[in-house]
Protein backbone atom coordinates (compact mmCIF):
# COMPACT_ATOMS: atom_id res chain seq x y z
CA UNK A 1 0.00 0.00 0.00
CA UNK A 2 2.96 2.31 0.61
CA UNK A 3 3.85 2.53 -3.07
CA UNK A 4 0.21 3.29 -3.89
CA UNK A 5 0.12 6.19 -1.43
CA UNK A 6 3.22 7.68 -3.03
CA UNK A 7 1.07 8.42 -6.08
CA UNK A 8 -1.07 10.76 -3.97
CA UNK A 9 1.73 12.58 -2.14
CA UNK A 10 1.58 15.86 -4.06
CA UNK A 11 -2.23 15.94 -3.90
CA UNK A 12 -2.14 15.32 -0.15
CA UNK A 13 0.31 18.17 0.40
CA UNK A 14 -1.77 20.52 -1.75
CA UNK A 15 -5.01 19.63 0.03
CA UNK A 16 -3.47 20.00 3.49
CA UNK A 17 -2.20 23.44 2.49
CA UNK A 18 -5.65 24.48 1.32
CA UNK A 19 -7.27 23.46 4.61
CA UNK A 20 -4.57 25.16 6.68
CA UNK A 21 -5.22 28.46 4.89
CA UNK A 22 -8.66 28.62 6.51
CA UNK A 23 -8.53 30.30 9.93
CA UNK A 24 -10.90 27.81 11.54
CA UNK A 25 -10.37 28.95 15.12
CA UNK A 26 -13.60 29.57 17.02
CA UNK A 27 -15.48 32.73 16.02
CA UNK A 28 -18.86 34.07 17.17
CA UNK A 29 -21.83 32.32 15.59
CA UNK A 30 -23.44 34.12 12.66
CA UNK A 31 -26.47 32.90 10.75
CA UNK A 32 -25.93 29.31 9.63
CA UNK A 33 -22.33 29.30 10.84
CA UNK A 34 -22.24 28.10 14.48
CA UNK A 35 -18.45 28.51 14.76
CA UNK A 36 -17.91 31.28 12.23
CA UNK A 37 -18.00 31.36 8.42
CA UNK A 38 -14.38 30.44 7.83
CA UNK A 39 -14.69 27.23 9.82
CA UNK A 40 -17.77 26.32 7.77
CA UNK A 41 -15.86 27.14 4.57
CA UNK A 42 -13.10 24.77 5.65
CA UNK A 43 -15.62 22.00 6.30
CA UNK A 44 -17.31 22.54 2.95
CA UNK A 45 -13.97 22.47 1.14
CA UNK A 46 -13.14 19.15 2.79
CA UNK A 47 -16.52 17.62 1.95
CA UNK A 48 -16.34 18.90 -1.64
CA UNK A 49 -12.93 17.28 -1.98
CA UNK A 50 -14.38 13.98 -0.73
CA UNK A 51 -17.40 14.25 -3.03
CA UNK A 52 -15.10 14.80 -6.01
CA UNK A 53 -13.40 11.53 -5.06
CA UNK A 54 -16.75 9.79 -5.38
CA UNK A 55 -17.65 9.45 -1.71
CA UNK A 56 -21.05 10.02 -0.13
CA UNK A 57 -20.85 13.06 2.15
CA UNK A 58 -23.08 14.81 4.69
CA UNK A 59 -22.85 18.28 6.21
CA UNK A 60 -24.78 18.49 9.46
CA UNK A 61 -25.57 22.20 9.73
CA UNK A 62 -21.92 23.30 9.56
CA UNK A 63 -21.29 21.69 12.95
CA UNK A 64 -19.78 18.48 11.64
CA UNK A 65 -19.46 16.52 8.41
CA UNK A 66 -18.94 12.92 7.43
CA UNK A 67 -17.57 10.90 4.53
CA UNK A 68 -18.99 7.40 3.92
CA UNK A 69 -17.10 4.43 2.46
CA UNK A 70 -18.48 0.89 2.32
CA UNK A 71 -21.43 -0.97 3.82
CA UNK A 72 -22.02 -3.00 6.95
CA UNK A 73 -21.57 -2.37 10.65
CA UNK A 74 -20.42 1.20 11.16
CA UNK A 75 -16.86 2.10 12.14
CA UNK A 76 -15.85 5.68 12.98
CA UNK A 77 -12.71 7.62 12.20
CA UNK A 78 -12.94 10.86 14.19
CA UNK A 79 -10.99 13.92 13.07
CA UNK A 80 -11.47 17.68 13.30
CA UNK A 81 -10.88 20.77 11.19
CA UNK A 82 -11.04 23.49 13.85
CA UNK A 83 -7.88 24.85 15.44
CA UNK A 84 -6.88 26.79 18.52
CA UNK A 85 -6.10 30.48 17.96
CA UNK A 86 -2.78 31.13 16.24
CA UNK A 87 -1.17 32.98 19.12
CA UNK A 88 2.10 34.82 18.60
CA UNK A 89 5.74 34.02 17.85
CA UNK A 90 5.29 32.23 14.53
CA UNK A 91 8.31 31.87 12.24
CA UNK A 92 5.94 31.67 9.26
CA UNK A 93 2.35 32.98 8.92
CA UNK A 94 0.11 30.59 10.90
CA UNK A 95 -2.43 30.35 8.08
CA UNK A 96 0.03 30.70 5.22
CA UNK A 97 0.71 26.96 4.75
CA UNK A 98 4.32 27.74 3.84
CA UNK A 99 6.27 24.75 2.52
CA UNK A 100 9.85 24.82 3.76
CA UNK A 101 12.59 22.20 3.69
CA UNK A 102 15.32 24.12 5.47
CA UNK A 103 16.59 21.84 8.31
CA UNK A 104 17.79 24.91 10.20
CA UNK A 105 14.14 25.80 10.86
CA UNK A 106 13.92 22.97 13.37
CA UNK A 107 12.32 19.56 13.50
CA UNK A 108 13.11 16.56 11.33
CA UNK A 109 14.76 17.03 7.92
CA UNK A 110 12.56 16.97 4.84
CA UNK A 111 9.70 18.99 3.44
CA UNK A 112 7.47 20.52 6.12
CA UNK A 113 4.21 22.44 5.93
CA UNK A 114 4.14 25.29 8.45
CA UNK A 115 0.80 26.40 9.83
CA UNK A 116 -1.81 26.02 12.54
CA UNK A 117 -3.54 22.66 12.19
CA UNK A 118 -0.94 20.85 10.10
CA UNK A 119 -0.63 18.21 12.82
CA UNK A 120 -3.74 18.93 14.90
CA UNK A 121 -5.78 17.86 13.05
CA UNK A 122 -6.12 19.00 9.44
CA UNK A 123 -3.07 17.11 8.20
CA UNK A 124 -4.24 13.76 9.63
CA UNK A 125 -7.84 14.36 8.46
CA UNK A 126 -6.75 14.99 4.86
CA UNK A 127 -4.32 12.06 4.94
CA UNK A 128 -7.04 9.66 6.10
CA UNK A 129 -9.32 10.90 3.32
CA UNK A 130 -6.66 10.09 0.72
CA UNK A 131 -6.10 6.69 2.32
CA UNK A 132 -9.78 5.96 1.76
CA UNK A 133 -9.46 7.20 -1.82
CA UNK A 134 -6.44 4.95 -2.42
CA UNK A 135 -8.36 1.94 -1.13
CA UNK A 136 -11.36 2.86 -3.26
CA UNK A 137 -9.23 3.35 -6.37
CA UNK A 138 -7.64 -0.07 -5.82
CA UNK A 139 -11.09 -1.66 -5.79
CA UNK A 140 -11.06 -2.51 -2.09
CA UNK A 141 -14.47 -3.19 -0.55
CA UNK A 142 -14.48 -2.77 3.26
CA UNK A 143 -16.55 -5.17 5.32
CA UNK A 144 -17.66 -2.26 7.50
CA UNK A 145 -19.26 1.09 6.75
CA UNK A 146 -16.43 3.54 7.44
CA UNK A 147 -17.60 6.96 8.59
CA UNK A 148 -14.89 9.61 8.53
CA UNK A 149 -16.43 12.18 10.88
CA UNK A 150 -14.86 15.65 10.84
CA UNK A 151 -15.86 18.02 13.63
CA UNK A 152 -15.57 21.80 13.82
CA UNK A 153 -15.48 22.37 17.60
CA UNK A 154 -13.14 19.77 19.05
CA UNK A 155 -10.86 22.40 20.58
CA UNK A 156 -13.57 24.30 22.44
CA UNK A 157 -16.15 21.97 23.93
CA UNK A 158 -17.14 19.34 21.37
CA UNK A 159 -20.42 21.01 20.42
CA UNK A 160 -19.87 19.44 17.00
CA UNK A 161 -20.10 15.91 18.39
CA UNK A 162 -23.03 16.84 20.62
CA UNK A 163 -24.85 17.99 17.48
CA UNK A 164 -23.86 14.86 15.57
CA UNK A 165 -25.34 12.67 18.29
CA UNK A 166 -28.63 14.57 17.91
CA UNK A 167 -28.92 14.24 14.13
CA UNK A 168 -27.06 10.99 13.40
CA UNK A 169 -25.87 7.83 15.15
CA UNK A 170 -22.32 7.57 16.40
CA UNK A 171 -20.72 4.19 15.64
CA UNK A 172 -19.86 2.06 18.65
CA UNK A 173 -16.28 1.53 17.56
CA UNK A 174 -13.54 3.55 15.91
CA UNK A 175 -10.33 5.49 16.31
CA UNK A 176 -9.06 9.04 15.95
CA UNK A 177 -5.97 10.13 13.96
CA UNK A 178 -5.38 12.90 16.50
CA UNK A 179 -2.61 11.54 18.72
CA UNK A 180 0.83 9.98 18.67
CA UNK A 181 2.01 6.75 17.08
CA UNK A 182 1.64 3.88 17.46
CA UNK A 183 -1.73 3.79 19.28
CA UNK A 184 -3.11 5.51 22.36
CA UNK A 185 -5.40 3.45 24.59
CA UNK A 186 -5.91 5.94 27.46
CA UNK A 187 -6.19 9.70 27.83
CA UNK A 188 -6.71 12.07 30.72
CA UNK A 189 -10.05 13.66 31.52
CA UNK A 190 -10.70 17.38 31.03
CA UNK A 191 -12.21 19.73 33.59
CA UNK A 192 -12.54 23.46 32.96
CA UNK A 193 -13.74 25.58 35.86
CA UNK A 194 -14.25 29.30 36.36
CA UNK A 195 -13.46 30.67 39.84
CA UNK A 196 -14.34 34.08 41.26
CA UNK A 197 -12.08 35.78 43.82
CA UNK A 198 -13.40 38.91 45.60
CA UNK A 199 -10.76 41.65 45.91
CA UNK A 200 -11.17 44.08 48.81
CA UNK A 201 -8.57 46.54 47.52
CA UNK A 202 -7.75 45.49 43.96
CA UNK A 203 -4.31 46.64 42.78
CA UNK A 204 -5.67 47.27 39.29
CA UNK A 205 -8.53 49.15 37.65
CA UNK A 206 -8.97 46.60 34.88
CA UNK A 207 -7.46 43.28 33.86
CA UNK A 208 -7.79 41.01 30.84
CA UNK A 209 -5.72 37.93 30.06
CA UNK A 210 -5.80 34.99 27.66
CA UNK A 211 -7.79 33.99 24.59
CA UNK A 212 -8.90 30.38 25.13
CA UNK A 213 -9.11 28.14 28.15
CA UNK A 214 -7.06 25.42 26.43
CA UNK A 215 -4.14 27.70 25.56
CA UNK A 216 -1.46 28.84 27.99
CA UNK A 217 -1.94 32.60 28.44
CA UNK A 218 0.80 34.47 26.59
CA UNK A 219 -0.56 38.01 26.98
CA UNK A 220 -2.07 39.81 29.99
CA UNK A 221 -2.80 43.50 30.43
CA UNK A 222 -3.90 45.52 33.46
CA UNK A 223 -4.33 49.18 34.37
CA UNK A 224 -2.70 49.55 37.78
CA UNK A 225 -3.57 51.68 40.78
CA UNK A 226 -0.96 54.32 41.71
CA UNK A 227 0.33 52.19 44.60
CA UNK A 228 0.77 49.12 42.39
CA UNK A 229 2.39 51.27 39.70
CA UNK A 230 5.10 52.31 42.15
CA UNK A 231 5.82 48.70 43.06
CA UNK A 232 6.11 47.41 39.50
CA UNK A 233 9.04 49.73 38.76
CA UNK A 234 11.34 47.73 41.01
CA UNK A 235 9.96 44.28 40.20
CA UNK A 236 11.89 41.65 38.22
CA UNK A 237 9.78 38.93 36.57
CA UNK A 238 10.86 35.33 36.09
CA UNK A 239 12.89 34.23 33.08
CA UNK A 240 10.82 33.86 29.90
CA UNK A 241 8.42 36.64 30.96
CA UNK A 242 8.52 40.29 29.90
CA UNK A 243 6.94 43.22 31.77
CA UNK A 244 6.17 46.36 29.77
CA UNK A 245 4.91 49.27 31.87
CA UNK A 246 3.58 52.55 30.49
CA UNK A 247 3.93 55.24 33.16
CA UNK A 248 1.51 57.67 31.53
CA UNK A 249 -1.44 55.28 31.56
CA UNK A 250 -0.26 53.03 34.43
CA UNK A 251 -0.76 50.10 32.05
CA UNK A 252 1.16 46.89 32.64
CA UNK A 253 1.45 44.39 29.81
CA UNK A 254 2.91 40.97 30.54
CA UNK A 255 4.00 38.66 27.74
CA UNK A 256 4.86 34.99 28.02
CA UNK A 257 4.85 32.01 25.70
CA UNK A 258 1.80 30.13 24.46
CA UNK A 259 1.43 26.35 24.55
CA UNK A 260 -1.42 23.87 24.55
CA UNK A 261 -3.34 23.91 27.82
CA UNK A 262 -2.61 20.22 28.31
CA UNK A 263 1.15 20.89 28.42
CA UNK A 264 1.51 24.09 30.47
CA UNK A 265 5.15 23.30 31.22
CA UNK A 266 5.98 24.05 27.58
CA UNK A 267 4.74 27.64 27.89
CA UNK A 268 5.30 30.67 30.08
CA UNK A 269 2.03 31.83 31.62
CA UNK A 270 1.66 35.61 31.45
CA UNK A 271 -1.37 35.55 33.76
CA UNK A 272 0.58 33.60 36.35
CA UNK A 273 3.47 36.06 36.17
CA UNK A 274 1.10 39.00 36.59
CA UNK A 275 -0.69 37.42 39.55
CA UNK A 276 2.65 36.53 41.13
CA UNK A 277 3.55 40.23 41.08
CA UNK A 278 0.22 41.24 42.63
CA UNK A 279 0.54 38.43 45.19
CA UNK A 280 3.78 39.94 46.44
CA UNK A 281 1.81 42.70 48.19
CA UNK A 282 -1.93 41.89 48.01
CA UNK A 283 -3.41 39.08 50.14
CA UNK A 284 -6.50 38.51 47.99
CA UNK A 285 -4.36 38.12 44.87
CA UNK A 286 -2.05 35.83 46.82
CA UNK A 287 -5.03 33.66 47.68
CA UNK A 288 -5.86 33.29 43.98
CA UNK A 289 -2.23 32.74 42.98
CA UNK A 290 -1.58 30.12 45.65
CA UNK A 291 -4.67 28.15 44.71
CA UNK A 292 -4.29 28.26 40.94
CA UNK A 293 -0.55 28.47 40.36
CA UNK A 294 1.18 27.32 43.57
CA UNK A 295 -1.02 24.20 43.93
CA UNK A 296 -2.07 24.94 47.49
CA UNK A 297 -4.58 22.07 47.30
CA UNK A 298 -1.94 19.55 46.17
CA UNK A 299 -4.05 18.60 43.15
CA UNK A 300 -0.91 17.90 41.15
CA UNK A 301 -0.17 14.95 43.43
CA UNK A 302 -2.93 13.07 41.58
CA UNK A 303 -1.29 10.71 39.08
CA UNK A 304 -1.41 7.32 37.39
CA UNK A 305 -0.01 5.67 34.24
CA UNK A 306 -1.35 8.56 32.11
CA UNK A 307 0.69 11.07 34.07
CA UNK A 308 0.19 13.76 36.68
CA UNK A 309 -2.73 16.18 36.91
CA UNK A 310 -1.96 19.48 35.15
CA UNK A 311 -3.50 22.90 35.81
CA UNK A 312 -3.37 25.78 33.36
CA UNK A 313 -5.22 28.97 34.40
CA UNK A 314 -5.57 30.50 30.95
CA UNK A 315 -8.21 33.25 30.92
CA UNK A 316 -8.96 36.03 33.42
CA UNK A 317 -11.07 39.17 33.70
CA UNK A 318 -11.93 41.73 36.37
CA UNK A 319 -15.70 41.88 36.87
CA UNK A 320 -17.60 43.80 39.57
CA UNK A 321 -14.74 43.73 42.04
CA UNK A 322 -13.98 40.06 41.41
CA UNK A 323 -11.05 38.44 39.67
CA UNK A 324 -12.56 35.70 37.49
CA UNK A 325 -10.14 33.03 36.28
CA UNK A 326 -10.91 30.04 34.05
CA UNK A 327 -8.60 27.07 34.46
CA UNK A 328 -7.89 24.02 32.30
CA UNK A 329 -7.34 20.82 34.31
CA UNK A 330 -6.29 17.51 32.74
CA UNK A 331 -6.65 14.72 35.28
CA UNK A 332 -5.38 11.11 35.23
CA UNK A 333 -7.59 8.57 33.47
CA UNK A 334 -8.23 6.35 36.50
CA UNK A 335 -9.46 9.25 38.64
CA UNK A 336 -12.85 10.98 38.80
CA UNK A 337 -13.77 14.63 38.54
CA UNK A 338 -15.46 14.44 41.95
CA UNK A 339 -12.03 14.03 43.54
CA UNK A 340 -11.20 17.49 42.21
CA UNK A 341 -14.52 19.19 42.95
CA UNK A 342 -14.52 17.84 46.51
CA UNK A 343 -11.17 19.54 47.10
CA UNK A 344 -12.35 22.79 45.52
CA UNK A 345 -15.49 22.72 47.66
CA UNK A 346 -13.34 22.69 50.80
CA UNK A 347 -11.59 25.87 49.61
CA UNK A 348 -14.84 27.80 50.04
CA UNK A 349 -14.49 29.60 46.71
CA UNK A 350 -17.16 30.43 44.18
CA UNK A 351 -16.66 28.36 41.06
CA UNK A 352 -18.58 26.65 38.29
CA UNK A 353 -17.74 23.85 35.88
CA UNK A 354 -17.77 25.16 32.31
CA UNK A 355 -16.61 22.02 30.48
CA UNK A 356 -16.09 18.37 31.35
CA UNK A 357 -14.93 15.40 29.31
CA UNK A 358 -14.55 12.03 30.96
CA UNK A 359 -11.23 10.19 30.67
CA UNK A 360 -10.84 7.68 27.85
CA UNK A 361 -9.72 4.09 28.31
CA UNK A 362 -9.69 1.15 25.91
CA UNK A 363 -8.41 -2.30 26.82
CA UNK A 364 -4.86 -2.45 25.39
CA UNK A 365 -5.31 -6.21 24.96
CA UNK A 366 -8.67 -5.89 23.19
CA UNK A 367 -9.35 -6.61 19.52
CA UNK A 368 -9.34 -2.97 18.35
CA UNK A 369 -5.94 -2.04 19.82
CA UNK A 370 -4.45 -5.40 18.82
CA UNK A 371 -5.63 -4.88 15.23
CA UNK A 372 -4.32 -1.32 15.02
CA UNK A 373 -0.97 -2.37 16.47
CA UNK A 374 -0.76 -5.36 14.15
CA UNK A 375 -1.22 -3.15 11.10
CA UNK A 376 1.28 -0.60 12.41
CA UNK A 377 3.98 -3.16 13.18
CA UNK A 378 3.46 -5.03 9.91
CA UNK A 379 3.65 -1.84 7.87
CA UNK A 380 6.85 -0.62 9.53
CA UNK A 381 8.39 -4.07 10.07
CA UNK A 382 8.74 -2.96 13.65
CA UNK A 383 7.63 -4.16 17.07
CA UNK A 384 5.95 -1.51 19.22
CA UNK A 385 3.50 -1.57 22.09
CA UNK A 386 0.42 0.62 22.53
CA UNK A 387 0.82 3.52 24.90
CA UNK A 388 -1.26 6.04 26.82
CA UNK A 389 -1.34 9.79 26.50
CA UNK A 390 -1.14 12.20 29.40
CA UNK A 391 -3.08 14.92 27.57
CA UNK A 392 -5.88 15.46 25.05
Regions found by a protein language model. Give the residues of each.
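Histidine-centered divalent metal-coordination motifs
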Residues: 80, 260, 382
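Active-site metal-coordination/substrate-binding segment of hydrolases
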Residues: 74-150, 156, 168-169
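Short, low-order "capping/linker" segments at domain edges
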Residues: 293-301, 305-306, 361-376
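N-terminal helical capping/dimerization or prosegment-like subdomains
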Residues: 1-87, 324-326, 343
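Single conserved hydrophobic/aromatic residue that forms the stacking wall/gate
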Residues: 381-392
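Generic non-transmembrane alpha-helical segments
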Residues: 8-11, 15-22, 45, 49-53, ...
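Short proline/glycine- and acidic-rich turn/helix-capping motifs at secondary-structure junctions
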Residues: 247-253, 352-366
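Midchain, well-structured core segments that form catalytic/ion-binding scaffolds
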Residues: 155, 161-332
